[in-house]
Amino acid sequence: MAQDSNNLIWIDMEMTGLNPNTDCIIEIALVVTDAQLNTVAEAPVLVISQPDSVLNGMDKWNQSTHGKSGLIDKVKASTLSEAEAEARMLAFLAPYVPADISPMCGNSICQDRRFLARCMPQLEAYFHYRNLDVSTLKELAKRWKPEVAQGFNKQGKHEALADIYDSIEELKHYRQHLFNI
């Protein structure tokens, strides 16, 4: 497949917490869509190894959520470093989207960007500086058209790949019901 500068890169990560200065990435997924939000390619979901000291430092919410999903066990079994995960994701993206073209797409994407800037700076730099943050549309819909905001229910699995597809479907919902496109 040839690179397409209209393609969009969607990202979601699961982390050990919300502080990008002290918490760590434990799962990362990427999906490339075309401009009409059709899936072009899906990267393998990567689970990143973290030491027990990092996992034991998670708050109750993260321990419960990532424990129930099985992610903690996957992290313990993983041998993949952040650097290796970053290299694999960059290799995945290269055939589909030129560097510095696609905005970073997802929900509350600024948080992902903050973690990438510290933990995977080359991957963060692959994105354009702009963001396509679906949560912005959610906040506007809540205020301007509450019925549109209430008309979409996310699965909320807190699994990176499932959350990306939730975000894509949510953007399709707003495209149809907020923008009438």
Swiss-Prot record:
Active-site positions on this chain: 129
Record localization: Cytoplasm
Question: Do you know which CDD domains this protein is assigned to?
Answer: Orn (cd06135)
All residue ranges annotated as the Exonuclease domain in the record: 8-171
Which biological process annotations from GO are given for this protein? Answer: DNA metabolic process
Q: Which residues form a coiled coil?
A: none
Q: What does this protein do?
A: 3'-to-5' exoribonuclease specific for small oligoribonucleotides.
For this UniProt record, give its keywords in alphabetical order, as a comma-separated list. Answer: Cytoplasm, Exonuclease, Hydrolase, Nuclease
Which domain of life, per UniProt?
Answer: Bacteria
EC number, as in UniProt: 3.1.15.-
Q: Give the protein's recorded name.
A: Oligoribonuclease
Molecular function in Gene Ontology: 3'-5'-RNA exonuclease activity; nucleic acid binding
Kind of enzyme, top EC level?
A: hydrolase
UniProt lists the family membership as follows: Belongs to the oligoribonuclease family.
Question: Which PANTHER family does the entry link to?
Answer: OLIGORIBONUCLEASE, MITOCHONDRIAL
Q: Name one GO cellular component term.
A: cytoplasm
Matches recorded under SUPFAM superfamilies: Ribonuclease H-like (SSF53098)
Q: Decide whether keyword DNA repair is in the record.
A: no
